[in-house]
């Protein structure tokens, strides 16, 4: 008969300072299918180390160990996990049940890593618990069960995937005599059903119930009777749960990891909330700064556009503040006509201006009088609350008409409901009011200077008596590059004048400068907010490292029942990501509240959340969870199952 478990010259040593301490010294042992074997020995004899090697939790330093003819030394970590999952079931002295899971959920754990569907897992767990007399305790937590009941749950867990080989480490060590008898009776039943039962104990009475007692002393076998040739197997073996395909196993493991992550968060609500707080503040800061910053930028740009966009202003002289007399008459009406003929010009509006006194009845105020064309108001985004702008007939005829701004209207006509048709004095020239222009409210504030507008022909011919222009505003056609238009305009006037006695001011250049400046400021503020997100991520990493330390034994249990290192990595990584995702969702909610509050105090701001901003926030949460959860998850996955099980 071929042995099920075959050990040849197994040695196991551990480093102790500069030396190696040999715990197992050339163990040679054969165990056959269906046997009930007891391994006995005093504390420190090496029996627990031997059990760990038998259960593929540990590897021998030298020697050969075969399971069903397969040399375990040739297997990688995942293959060893599969071997434990499909062939071995562990029963521990201290039960090693997961305290936050019910009895039924504890029994299900091995099948989770085998990729068994939830419905099948549930039925199998209920069947095993019913067989072991715990059908009325399926929803109980370990703390609600007696020691004997916990050990029976442990046995059911060992049988979940079939449990061809049952490894029982001091299964009765923490039980009273009655519970001890119950557990031993169950082990005998398992042996009768065809399971190979290996009991590690120091109790002679427990060992005496085995068919074969192997004694180990100081790492060497001192008694090893031959195996019984015929093993009585009354019933069939347990149905073996085969490992599912890679995809099914991944999906099952992912769902279980997600469920376990949620339970872990719910078990420590205050700590979880405090951990999330950093993520909440970080995400809320990033989203709020992006959204509110964008609203502020749009407000600034809207104010600039209200002044007039896609326009180029032409002034006489070398630059602002140049009052050299030789340049004052640089711009002529012929220049205006030449500019209007260019194919890239939508309109060209001249301007002449002078500070004058305005009088109506007994009201006398100072104002800025501006001679413009009818297109001026459209170029600068102005609307009319009363009346309208000049028409071409009024421009050609130098009509004595005037448009007031709203401030001038209030000064001259504080009690009149309609001022169109009223006559005022502009300087010494009577002029009929034909409209009241409303300038767009700007976040930069309004000018305190009273302003009126007359036809440029009237202003230059009747009021000022000059033949030159103070400035020309050129509106560029849509789709034409403003910078190129500015170059062509400069070239045109330079050729006409024979020199460059003027300068230009491009509003689009100002707009681009403002856009660049606001974008830079927004980026800087976002980077500051990202720092708070990083701090929150470090908090997540810290708590996850603490969690790994606190749950070391749980990790060992999961590895013992068949979890791979990748399963453990996935478990803790999902927990970190879940913390960050929930924190991210709360952070977005907080940023919405901040935005709505600001909207109440700043009604002119258009604060909106684009789907892209929300998507980026969730991506930030996920990436934060992955980045800062990777190290703790990797540490958990690298734990040695034997060391993990030994920790309290």
From Swiss-Prot:
A Gene Ontology biological process term: response to antibiotic
Localization of this protein = Cell inner membrane
Q: GO molecular function of the protein, one example?
A: ATP hydrolysis activity
Keywords for the protein's UniProt record, in alphabetical order:
Antibiotic resistance, ATP-binding, Cell inner membrane, Cell membrane, Membrane, Nucleotide-binding, Translocase, Transmembrane, Transmembrane helix, Transport
Q: Which SMART domains match?
A: AAA
Stored InterPro entries: AAA+_ATPase, ABC3_permease_C, ABC_transporter-like_ATP-bd, ABC_transporter-like_CS, MacB-like_ATP-bd, MacB_PCD, Macrolide_Exporter_MacB, P-loop_NTPase
Q: Which residues form the ABC transporter domain?
A: 5-243
| Record-listed E.C. numbers | 7.6.2.-
The entry marks the following residues as binding ATP, namely 41-48
Q: What is its main location?
A: membrane
Tell me what topology the record assigns in the membrane: Multi-pass membrane protein
Q: Which residues cross the membrane?
A: 273-293, 523-543, 576-596, 611-631
* Coiled coil start-end: none
Q: Which GO terms describe its cellular component?
A: plasma membrane
Listed under subunit, the entry gives: Homodimer. Part of the tripartite efflux system MacAB-TolC, which is composed of an inner membrane transporter, MacB, a periplasmic membrane fusion protein, MacA, and an outer membrane component, TolC. The complex forms a large protein conduit and can translocate molecules across both the inner and outer membranes. Interacts with MacA.
Q: Which family does it belong to?
A: Belongs to the ABC transporter superfamily. Macrolide exporter (TC 3.A.1.122) family.
Task: State the function annotated in the UniProt record.
Answer: Part of the tripartite efflux system MacAB-TolC. MacB is a non-canonical ABC transporter that contains transmembrane domains (TMD), which form a pore in the inner membrane, and an ATP-binding domain (NBD), which is responsible for energy generation. Confers resistance against macrolides.
Name of this chain's protein = Macrolide export ATP-binding/permease protein MacB
